[in-house]
Amino acid sequence: MEGRRVFAELTVDENLVTGGITNTDRKAIAASHDRVMTMFPLLADRRKDVAGYLSGGEQQMLAIGRALMADPKLLILDEPSLGLAPKLVGQIRDTIVAINEAGTSVLLIEQNANMALSIADYGYIMETGKVVMDGEAAKLLKDEDIQEFYLGLHGDEGERKSFRDVKHYKRRKRWLS
């Protein structure tokens, strides 16, 4: 779901119905629809509006809501906070927590490491397509190297260092001390 994948020409309700298309039980579809509207009250107010006219945050909520219409056991979210205002990032974060607490497993791919690790059980730090570190999310949040990298360690010329550079620098610094 990177970006906001909605059917711009369909209404909010029509977008949600497409998410439950594999379900033939009308009562189950209605229950899923009600659950999504309860989870996203902003969408309930805009249910007859065309999705292309929704704000970025509302489109992201709609995309997540549409995925939830299928009542998944696993929800994969790719960059759900992409391009959102900080207030909306908090709302999306809270929604992800609620989805998980309701029994749906969530696989979250996110560049906002602080947000992602604050709600995750386990995390993987990737760089150029490779896992460079993994572990319990709470431990990763407290890791000095992760904090230093995500706070933006700058080299002598002011360039941003990669995680590997930070690890190499710190190992060398400790060894030479």
Model-predicted segments: where are they?
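ABC-type ATPase nucleotide-binding domains, specifically the catalytic core motifs of the NBD
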Residues: E9-I29, M39-A44, K48, G152-H154
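ABC ATPase signature
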Residues: L10, Y53-L54, A67-L68
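Conserved ABC ATPase signature
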Residues: V50-L54, E58
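A short, proline-enriched helix->beta-strand linker immediately N-terminal to the Walker B motif
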Residues: M69-K73, E79
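Helical segment within the ABC ATPase nucleotide-binding domain
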Residues: V89-A102
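Short, glycine/charged-rich "phosphate-handling" switch motifs in NTP-dependent
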Residues: Y122, D134
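ABC ATPase nucleotide-binding domains
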Residues: L153-S177
